[in-house]
Amino acid sequence: MFGSSRGGVRGGQDQFNWEDVKTDKQRENYLGNSLMAPVGRWQKGRDLTWYAKDRAPCTGPSREEELAAVREAEREALLAALGYKNVRKQPTGLSKEDFVEICKREGGDPEEKGVDRLLGLGSASGSAGRVALSREDKEAAKLGLSVFTHHRVDSEGPSTAPSATRKKPRAEDKAELDAESHKKSKKEKKKKKKKHKKHKKKKDKEHKREADSCSSSPSPARPRRQRHSDFSPCYKRKREHSQDSGRNPSHRRQDRSSDD
């Protein structure tokens, strides 16, 4: 009717003992994986309290040392920004690929260029002027890379032809020259158009002035055309009558007396 009674003590702490739990056959029914009484083969012979033991000391710098290093770096950066400290830039040397590229740009082989055949930065004369850097060299200088500015020296000496020292124009230089010439031609065309417009405006103004002067001056009197009616007999009679009426009355009386 009732199940089998299990072993163990249901009393207080004074009646409980861990050794009895370890030796009990039915401990898995009421006890989990406890550190005091490990159950199963995975817990036997293992250090189950490894996390509670002290760890090995760290070999890296402590937090205080790291904070002190950060503060020092910030102080140096602030002094450099304010100008109280000179920033020393470490020059980066040319790599082999950069050296080969520069030699190709100048048109010579890197093996032919020895140390004896190269001029240093201070060996150029004062009249030689500054070295014209290409676009790639300028970009490299902006990034902080060292620019190769040496020039090849011929064995003939300083009396070499200037044409030999000149570099061949590259495609980029040609493109820049073409763009500049195109801009100049555009500007010239604009100037010509402006001049043509000004000249045209002047001509129009002169024509307007002439037309105004002609309209303001009195037109010459045209000869009056004789109408066909002037030669008609009716017109002649009217004319004679007007002439007779315009005479003096004394003349009219004389005419009448003569008629009588």
Swiss-Prot record:
<feature type="modified residue" description="Phosphoserine">
    <location>
        <position position="219"/>
    </location>
</feature>
<dbReference type="InterPro" id="IPR019315">
    <property type="entry name" value="MMTA2_N"/>
</dbReference>
<feature type="compositionally biased region" description="Basic and acidic residues">
    <location>
        <begin position="170"/>
        <end position="182"/>
    </location>
</feature>
<feature type="modified residue" description="Phosphoserine">
    <location>
        <position position="123"/>
    </location>
</feature>
<dbReference type="InterPro" id="IPR039207">
    <property type="entry name" value="MMTAG2-like"/>
</dbReference>
<feature type="region of interest" description="Disordered">
    <location>
        <begin position="106"/>
        <end position="133"/>
    </location>
</feature>
<feature type="region of interest" description="Disordered">
    <location>
        <begin position="1"/>
        <end position="21"/>
    </location>
</feature>
<feature type="region of interest" description="Disordered">
    <location>
        <begin position="148"/>
        <end position="260"/>
    </location>
</feature>
<feature type="compositionally biased region" description="Gly residues">
    <location>
        <begin position="1"/>
        <end position="11"/>
    </location>
</feature>
<keyword id="KW-0832">Ubl conjugation</keyword>
<feature type="cross-link" description="Glycyl lysine isopeptide (Lys-Gly) (interchain with G-Cter in SUMO2)">
    <location>
        <position position="113"/>
    </location>
</feature>
<dbReference type="Pfam" id="PF10159">
    <property type="entry name" value="MMtag"/>
</dbReference>
<keyword id="KW-1017">Isopeptide bond</keyword>
<feature type="compositionally biased region" description="Basic residues">
    <location>
        <begin position="183"/>
        <end position="206"/>
    </location>
</feature>
<feature type="compositionally biased region" description="Low complexity">
    <location>
        <begin position="117"/>
        <end position="132"/>
    </location>
</feature>
<feature type="modified residue" description="Phosphoserine">
    <location>
        <position position="215"/>
    </location>
</feature>
<feature type="cross-link" description="Glycyl lysine isopeptide (Lys-Gly) (interchain with G-Cter in SUMO2)">
    <location>
        <position position="104"/>
    </location>
</feature>
<feature type="modified residue" description="Phosphoserine">
    <location>
        <position position="216"/>
    </location>
</feature>
<feature type="modified residue" description="Phosphoserine">
    <location>
        <position position="127"/>
    </location>
</feature>
<keyword id="KW-0597">Phosphoprotein</keyword>
<feature type="cross-link" description="Glycyl lysine isopeptide (Lys-Gly) (interchain with G-Cter in SUMO2)">
    <location>
        <position position="22"/>
    </location>
</feature>
<feature type="compositionally biased region" description="Basic and acidic residues">
    <location>
        <begin position="106"/>
        <end position="116"/>
    </location>
</feature>
<protein>
    <recommendedName>
        <fullName>Multiple myeloma tumor-associated protein 2 homolog</fullName>
    </recommendedName>
</protein>
